[in-house]
A protein has these predicted regions:
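PP2C/PPM-type serine/threonine phosphatase catalytic domain
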Residues: 2-269
Length: 269
């Protein structure tokens, strides 16, 4: 388990960020294989916020190594490579290429580590970058990014067997929730021969929130329960946000969630 927090919850542009996070090993596992990153910096475009969550594969040995190594690589990227990208006229395309290159490199590096030490390991990743009035997301696996405004929206698309079955009309979301294949990933950094990240971009509106979470955070609770606990009308202050996240962690555990549980939340004023 590795968590980097390098934030100051304020910005010099017309947007101000508040952040909260939580992580819990859960009720069954001895090791927390999740890792997370929250970083903030000032740029020519104002305050920039970067959030990443990685879920080391639960049934695979050394999943915490995979998630921590990818988080470390994203941290280095934000410090060393991101400032140069801001000079690109086609920023979105350059960012997508940079992130994709990073994912492919880490996919090979984690796979090589596994071969060297004769272990299976891998990790999901969901990353969110807020720059100016825009957001950018990259996703591999089944960690998620949600947007909370007038209601809750799932921005990322799970790269799982059951989601593919839903997309192709062979399962309903209700059937998928109890399907024994619900944890089977189609994409995983370090355990997939070919990784095809999902890249998203959109405009950031004021008075909204972003929630990044691993699958352990949302297995046993509904999106509506997330919204009712974490919306701006309910969780007003930073302390409220932190308490809301912790409440949902305990709710998951009380409902016998067995996985590690991690979530990050960003409020945009």
């Amino acid at each position: 388990m590795i968590v980097y927090l390098e934030i100051h919850d304020e910005g010099t542009n017309d947007m101000k960020y508040q952040t909260a996070w939580c992580t819990d090993v859960g009720i069954r596992k001895d090791t927390n294989q999740d890792s997370a990153l929250l970083m903030q910096a000032e740029s020519v475009q104002g305050s920039v916020l970067f959030a990443v969550i990685c879920d080391g594969m639960g049934g695979l040995a050394k999943g915490e190594v995979a998630s921590a190594s990818l988080i470390q690589r994203f941290r280095n990227w934000f410090v060393r490579e991101f400032p140069l990208l801001l000079q690109e006229s086609a920023f979105s395309a350059a960012l997508s290429q940079s992130w994709n290159r990073l994912i492919q490199e880490q996919n090979r590096a984690i796979a090589d580590y596994g071969q060297q030490f004769h272990v299976n390991l891998g990790t999901t990743v969901a990353a969110l970058l807020l720059v100016g009035d825009n957001y950018y997301i990259i996703n591999v696996g089944d960690s998620r990014v949600y947007l909370l405004s007038s209601q809750i929206y799932q921005l990322t698309h799970d790269q799982t067997v059951v989601q593919k079955e839903i997309d192709e009309g062979r399962l309903t979301p209700e059937q998928a929730a109890s399907d024994p294949r619900s944890s089977v990933l189609l994409q995983c950094v370090g355990a997939s021969q070919v990784v095809a990240p999902e890249f998203l971009a959109g405009e950031v509106e004021h008075s909204t929130r972003f929630l990044l979470c691993c699958d352990g955070f949302r297995h046993e609770i509904s999106p509506q329960e997330m919204y009712e606990t974490l919306s701006r009308s309910t969780a007003v202050t930073k302390q409220d946000m932190e308490q809301g996240l912790q409440y949902l962690v305990e709710l998951n555990k009380n409902r016998n969630e067995v996985d590690n549980i991690t979530a990050l939340m960003i409020d945009v004023e």
